[in-house]
Amino acid sequence: MSIQSILRKETLKKKDKNIDLQENNINDLVVSASRVIAPLWPISTFAAHHPWMGLEKQSFERVANWLKEARNVDIYPSASMIHSAKAKGEIEESFLQMALSRWLDSQSFHIPRKKVEQFCQAALKLEELPSSLLSSPQLNKLAEEMSYINTESMKDSFLQPVSSFIENQKGENLSDILNYHIIKWCKLYLDDSGSSWTMPNREQGLYRAWHHLIKFDPALSKTERKVLKDWPEDALIALTKALSELGISESNMQAYLEGHLLSLPGWAGMVRWRSQQSIEEQELLIEYLAVRLSMELAVVKPYLPLKNQKVEKKVSIVPLIASWIYWGDISTREWLQMSATEQSELLAFAYRFDENIRKKLWLEAWEQTHAEQLKKKISSKQRATNDKKRVVAQLAFCIDVRSEPFRRHLEKLGPFETFGIAGFFGLPIATTELGSNDSHPSLPVILKPKHQIKELTDENECKSYEQRKMVGSSVRYTFKTMKQNVLTSMLLPEVSGPLLGLQMVTRSFVPRRVGGFIRNLRKNMLQKPDTTFSLNHVHDTNCEIPIGFTKEEKVNYVRQALKMVGLTEGFAPLVVMCGHSSQSTNNPYAAALECGACGGAAGGFNARVFATLCNLPEVREALSAEGIKIPDDTIFAAAEHKTTVDELEWIYVPELSETAQEAFDCIEAIMPNVSQHANRERLMQLPNFKTKIKNPSKEAHRFAEDWSEIRPEWGLARNASFIIGQRELTQDCDLEGRAFLHNYDWKQDERGDILANIIAGPGTVAQWINLQYYASTVAPHYYGSGNKTTQTVTAGLGVMQGNASDLLPGLPWQSVMQSDRETYHSPLRLLIVIQAPTKYIEHLLNNDFTFREKVQNGWVRLASVDPEGRWKNW
């Protein structure tokens, strides 16, 4: 504990002796409460995350029940989604019956099994109880006569913010007014777009800046400003005082703070992310809560004290009786003839077999159907691993699900072998591109960079390039400054109108031609020179992390990646490391379509660095001494897979050997054909195309350049599985672009370390992506971001609906929905399939407690395929 924390703690004790902070101080409570929200990255570096990452110690079912009761957020698929999936053959009835039987076997009840099964079968149709039945006088009279039934065990109580209980004279809920104020202050403080007018005293932190300004806020009444007139200047003291004056007992503090964090999970998530980025803002979440609760006290103080701040959800027996009448064929006469014990037993069972349980069983059946279909695909394509065709080139792609169709068509049309690996290629680097002073952590967000890699060129070439780049930057800066200035903003439409009007017309009616022209013009004007990298280790005191790698680190990273995919022998003349990137116009979510393993950036930089390392003589010599012999005529190159147009762009091609040149020419010859096939398959999934596409590549480019296009590609929608194993396991299988594919050879992993690293790194990234798509599909109003066409990009951070909503944390409607009524993404929890002997899986689960917890608590599903091809569900 720091000296400042100790002094602050002592001050707190002197200020308010009613609150004992000896063990559970506010700092600890805020940290514990923050588990209910996930960090939210800025939209420019949209990083995959799932909203329940802090809740994985609890079961998925328990979190689902808690969210339903406490926030009325349903995280199971809706009835319409389930019915649609069943109609499309995605759910087999037999698996639903198996799930029901398992659940019934786990329950204790004294009702005839046949009667229970009849009730459950009818309830599982997911039909709403008729309103005529629920409101019928007969039913309500029966419920009155059964009022002696004890339902205390069915009650739940939840602590809610005080403001949520109160309405003002205009009928406005005070929590909505509070949210309005908090959104305003968050936008001011967190603004990352370089506004001309910034928040005064921003450098002192959120709370102090707010404290200086709140006394002048015209949106507050005199009474409200009076409450805050002599308010503490320290955030922690203010938070403690607010909790005390709101009447929150110490035992309820964490739950109360959780309620406030969940009120605006987007803004709170952004605050949490910022608090993790620098020491200066490490207490930002405390400051946020201090501002929020201080404002709440000011708003609600005239209404205090309240009699009860807990929401008690007393169970009505009316719908429970109605459910047995409608689904169990028990008449009102039969109810009256039962004993109180029998009545209680039926009501208790109906209460347990609620909507969440019914949807849970459907979800399990849906997931089991998918697993069975995947199992059949894999087993039908089993082949001997030693019967390999001769390959002229090997290409390593990111595990991203969009790589799967491209790899499949590439292998089908030529003598090529492909591999799957995390798109950062195991390089924990921060990248600095030529002419830039900013670095980007080009690795999964769960990791921290260990090396800084800079793009370099000749000094004169660099100056010339920077000057050309400065011209474009100056134009953008001037436009932005004019737009944000009070006077020049009125002149700007007159000056820029004709040019922007022309751009609007041409971009709308001939997007492919205009987009291509602008892209080529930009490329020709910049004329980026040939570059190298700062690969050799340099300790720069101005950098937090060292520049480049030592010789040992170079060898280690190359060895690690090659072993991870099982490529330690049988090298082809040409080995291509393929990063990936997306291409879209006027798209705030562009980063969401980039490489998740590279922190929301294109993966080409990492691919090029890795290929360069593999070509270094000192690296090859060291690997050869360890038994990894790369032939002299084998050359490593780098390319970038453009997922929106399914093209391969070469970004690093060193001098090639004769055999490598032949392989390169072979790839170039068949690539247009590969792109045509991959584009046709992908475009046919989009809602715009239901008929034959004459020129798939042309259409794909139109989508990429059309600035009115709300869905340039599906991204990672419909992802459902992560397959870890040799390519032979899935080769020739049409996995429909739904599987993350990571190469793995258990025979080269005696201790299981490689498998553990795959699960801890790429496995976690895949799980986060999967649950982000899941959450945005099942609860779009809470975890998604609504319709793209009505979004407002705010403060350079993210999007809102209008100008006073929560910062929307998830994916837009267009990323997961086919139409207003039909989903495209299937909300299934990720199925991880590992090709390895059973003992490897047992070793993994015994040694990786975090992963075992995820499997046991239902956050991921796990299956394995042993060397004999036997499938096992864990």
Swiss-Prot record:
Mode of membrane association: Peripheral membrane protein
Query: Which Pfam family, any one, appears in the UniProt record?
Result: DabA
Ligand binding (Zn(2+)): C398, D400, H580, C595
Recorded hits in InterPro entries, A to Z, give:
DabA
Chief localization:
membrane
Q: Which UniProt keywords apply?
A: Cell membrane, Membrane, Metal-binding, Transport, Zinc
Cellular-component GO terms for this entry: plasma membrane
Named from the GO MF annotations, one term is:
zinc ion binding
In which domain of life is the source organism classified?
Answer: Bacteria
Q: Where in the cell is it found?
A: Cell membrane
Q: Which cofactor does it need?
A: Zn(2+)
Fetch the PANTHER family from UniProt. INORGANIC CARBON TRANSPORTER SUBUNIT DABA-RELATED (PTHR38344:SF1), UPF0753 PROTEIN AQ_863 (PTHR38344)
Role description: Part of an energy-coupled inorganic carbon pump.
Q: How does it assemble?
A: Forms a complex with DabB.
Similarity remark: Belongs to the inorganic carbon transporter (TC 9.A.2) DabA family.
Name recorded for this polypeptide: Probable inorganic carbon transporter subunit DabA
From what organism does this protein derive?
Answer: Bacillus cereus (strain 03BB102)
